[in-house]
Amino acid sequence: DVSAGKNYIENRFLRAEIDEESGAVIKLTDKRSGKNFAGEKLGRAIICNDIKNDTWAHAVTEFNDEIGSFGGGKCEVIENGPIRATIKSTVKYNNSVFIRYYSLYSESDSLFVKCRLDFDEEYKLMKLCFETALQEPSVTYSMPYGSIEKDANSQEEPSHAWTDIHDRNGVGLGIINDGKYSFCACGNDRRR
């Protein structure tokens, strides 16, 4: 079975708690192990300054000049059935709106998130920060025909379909996407 309230969604495998103000996940607990994977906030949407770069940001290895974040959010349950439950989170930054649909299925141990961004900012970029509770993490990311593991050194790296941030015991958090091809990881914070 799966259920949702205004700020949480859960099934027999996972419980996710959403911070209404930021729209980020503040707890992501694996019910089988009791482990919480969320650090401060998983999926916090930040704004970085991009005024000094050319169109393609040649020779730039980091985009970490954080100047703001999305906020003023609201959450609402839009689906709460026996097979799937979904929470809609809406946050804003100036004229930009970021909507996320967090869904859990009754027999899945994955949290599904669909995102929709109306970004109306000049010389700025938006990044999603996945701050985990992992200690001394390493990062593995997908590349054509394989994967590669690197230290979490805050440099932008190409990544195609997925990224995995894990501790030395192999316990970690995987993020699968179909639309963005770059990320950076700094300590236990992974940014896409």
Predicted regions and their residues:
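C-terminal (or distal) subdomains of carbohydrate-active enzymes
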Residues: 1-192
